[in-house]
């Protein structure tokens, strides 16, 4: 066996290049900083309990300032400081959220979902609970991204099998979990609304939770996702090499029909050199 080290590709930012997306944004700013079409104020809608919406607002306030990464010196390269999400550094944009952009979930409605014994129906009702609020925001508020905050009760309800279902075979259990994946199903149902979704667990909103990533890493992950999902934004791009032609990356999805009788293949996404993606749908093809 021969091992080959492949160098990290260099990424272009506003006024410099770097191999690390986070350090590149901090040092040189997002690639599209001078673009006339990018969002400088990203309007965020949010769906969650009253407490979760307050915690989400507090999180955005903390993210508007720099956040120190892991304290250990030997981990500084892995966990860099967060530059802050504001108009003066890094992303050169602001995340905007207020009470008018929030939709509160009633505890009574959450409890109704949690009490449903059938797992498939429980997930369907949880999807409907969030979908109706997402639809309101998409149709009545000028939001760029909608954040869905999942309290522990909802997360457990959609991610854990009931004890009565624990006797099924492992293969069948995997298929059920895959087919009725809450995250994918909610995003698929809301796709026609034209607003990207970002799902967060309640535990991600608070600082220093047990077993969680450090605060700077969480901020980097959320900030980058929100900036990219806001549309017409490109935090970085691959450095151009004059000696090689541009290429794109293809993602191919395989999935079975609900009756498990047919296998469908779809060209899922095509990305250009800027990272912009097009979603394509393939047609049914015979297979043996």
Placement of each model-derived feature along the sequence:
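Long, low-complexity, intrinsically disordered terminal regions
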Residues: 1-288
């Amino acid at each position: 066996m021969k091992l080959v080290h492949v160098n990290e590709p260099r990424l272009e930012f506003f006024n410099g290049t770097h191999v690390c997306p986070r350090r590149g944004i901090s040092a040189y700013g997002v690639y599209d900083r001078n673009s006339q079409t990018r969002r400088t104020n990203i309007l965020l809608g949010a769906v969650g309990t009253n407490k979760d919406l307050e915690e989400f607002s507090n999180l955005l306030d903390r993210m508007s300032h720099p956040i120190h990464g892991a304290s250990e010196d030997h981990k500084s390269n892995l966990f860099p400081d967060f530059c802050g999400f504001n108009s003066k550094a890094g992303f050169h944009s602001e995340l905007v959220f207020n009470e008018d952009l929030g939709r509160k979930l009633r505890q009574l409605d959450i409890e109704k979902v949690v009490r449903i014994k059938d797992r498939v129906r429980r997930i369907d009702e949880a999807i409907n609970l969030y979908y109706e609020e997402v639809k309101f925001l998409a149709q009545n508020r000028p939001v760029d991204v909608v954040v869905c905050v999942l309290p522990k009760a909802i997360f457990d309800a959609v991610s854990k099998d009931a004890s009565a279902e624990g006797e099924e075979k492992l293969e069948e259990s995997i298929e059920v979990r895959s087919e009725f994946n809450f995250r994918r199903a909610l995003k698929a149902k809301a796709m026609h609304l034209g607003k990207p979704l970002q799902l967060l667990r309640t535990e991600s909103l608070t600082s220093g939770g047990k077993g969680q990533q450090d605060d700077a890493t969480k901020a980097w992950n959320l900030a980058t996702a929100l900036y990219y999902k806001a549309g017409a934004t490109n935090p970085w791009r691959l450095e151009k090499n004059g000696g090689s032609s541009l290429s794109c990356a293809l993602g191919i999805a395989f999935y079975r029909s609900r009756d498990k009788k047919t296998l469908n293949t779809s060209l899922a996404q095509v990305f250009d050199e800027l990272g912009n993606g097009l979603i394509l749908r393939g047609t049914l093809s015979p297979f043996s």
